[in-house]
């Protein structure tokens, strides 16, 4: 059997983390998300893998040795599958590129014309999959809150799905949705529904990305790469993953991921966070429940707040809408090549776009656009 991974999307809800990386290349404990997907597929005996690319495709093409198919329009999941129609000549497993799954898909592989579902505590974010006696009834785009089964973004199809993709009309969102194609297929021949067990994370929001890293941290425990220097008076509270060529000085690192070539300096504290490659947290910094992308440099005394003064849930602006993260503690999401001056304060839930500079003593209370220079 073969597999197709959809990795063409822009990952707009994950910005600024996807400013310069496709979401499938975002590192989870310093390894790209798509590597975990390919490893999971190969663990199930699936060696022939193709990837649909589009946005920031160069990174994927340089990293992977697989077949690539380009979705030039980037106009929905159905469009992405159709871009690889020449690859689809037999049964295949289809996997969304932003799904992190650590579990078994053996039953899905055994079940032709099927979709995987997972049980979650709140279906409202995902839409609910209704099925009876193992057969699909409907997929609710928006559902009420409460527990239920949701689309896991993993499928087992054959070339017949292409016939229904060709008939799929543009949705209200201006996209060609694979779920619409599946419902048409279901009216022709019943789609089977396969519940799967294991860790599942649809990495749609920046805090989902933190959660995926926290899951893998707990599995790994501790690791440090080659040529990394850890001072004897550094405090490392496991689980912690540190990359290669880092300098870990007199600091505290707790349940965090540090990429290659990073500096965590004197009297800095990094907790439940991801610091990507070649970033510096060098002096008297506080970083908690946050993500710092590659090539950043925090000025001395720069601190990221992770708790609202009123103890309410932290909200984040995603594509112009204020979204409740569902968590009391959440810091900031800092894009690539960001520099801050001394004593900068960054409020909870703030996003700072890539290539931005923040002047000394500034309090960053709202999102910063990419390429900005923020002054007092």
Regions found by a protein language model. Give the residues of each.
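Conserved N-terminal catalytic core of the sugar/cofactor nucleotidyltransferase
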Residues: 2-5, 13, 19, 26-27, ...
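Catalytic-core segments of class I nucleotidyltransferases/pyrophosphorylases
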Residues: 93, 106, 135-211, 216
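The conserved acidic donor/metal-binding loop of glycosyltransferases
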Residues: 97-100
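Conserved donor-nucleotide/metal-binding helix-loop-beta segment in metal-dependent transferases, i.e.
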Residues: 103-126
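Long, charged amphipathic helices and adjacent flexible linkers at domain junctions
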Residues: 216-235
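Pentapeptide-repeat beta-helix register
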Residues: 234, 239-240, 246, 251, ...
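Surface-exposed extracellular loop regions of Gram-negative outer-membrane beta-barrel proteins
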Residues: 263-265
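Glycine-rich hexapeptide-repeat left-handed beta-helix
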Residues: 272-376
């Amino acid at each position: 059997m073969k597999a197709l991974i959809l990795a063409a999307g822009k990952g707009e809800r994950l910005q600024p983390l996807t400013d310069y990386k496709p979401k499938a290349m975002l590192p989870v404990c310093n390894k790209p998300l798509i590597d975990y997907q390919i490893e999971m597929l190969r663990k199930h005996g699936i060696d022939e893998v193709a990837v649909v690319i589009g946005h920031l495709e160069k990174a994927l093409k340089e990293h992977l040795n697989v077949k690539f198919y380009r979705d030039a329009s980037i106009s929905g999941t159905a469009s992405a599958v159709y871009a690889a129609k020449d690859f689809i000549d037999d049964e295949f497993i289809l996997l969304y590129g932003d799904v992190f799954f650590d579990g078994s898909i053996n039953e899905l592989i055994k079940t032709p014309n099927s979709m995987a579902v997972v049980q979650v505590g709140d279906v409202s974010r995902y839409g609910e999959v209704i099925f009876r006696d193992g057969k699909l009834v409907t997929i609710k785009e928006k559902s009420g809150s409460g527990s239920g089964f949701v689309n896991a973004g993993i499928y087992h199809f054959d070339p017949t799905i292409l016939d229904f993709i060709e008939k799929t009309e543009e949705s209200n969102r201006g996209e060609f949705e694979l779920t619409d194609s599946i419902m048409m297929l279901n009216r022709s021949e019943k789609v089977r529904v396969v519940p799967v067990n294991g860790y599942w994370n649809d990495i749609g929001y920046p805090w989902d990305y933190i959660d995926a890293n926290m899951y893998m941290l707990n599995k790994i425990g501790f690791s440090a790469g080659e040529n990394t220097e850890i001072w004897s008076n550094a405090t490392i509270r496991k689980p912690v993953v540190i990359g290669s060529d880092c300098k870990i000085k007199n600091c505290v690192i707790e349940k965090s991921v540090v990429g290659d070539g990073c500096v965590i300096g004197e009297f800095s504290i990094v907790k439940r966070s991801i610091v990507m490659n070649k970033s510096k947290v060098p002096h008297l910094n506080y970083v908690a429940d946050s993500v710092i992308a590659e090539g950043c440099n925090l000025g001395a005394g720069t601190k990221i707040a992770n708790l609202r003064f009123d103890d309410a849930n932290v909200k984040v602006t995603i594509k112009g809408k204020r979204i409740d993260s569902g968590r009391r503690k959440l810091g900031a999401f800092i894009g690539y090549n960001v520099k801050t001056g001394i004593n900068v304060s960054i409020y909870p839930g703030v996003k700072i776009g890539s290539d931005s500079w923040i002047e000394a003593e500034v309090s960053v209370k709202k999102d910063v656009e990419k390429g900005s220079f923020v002054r007092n």
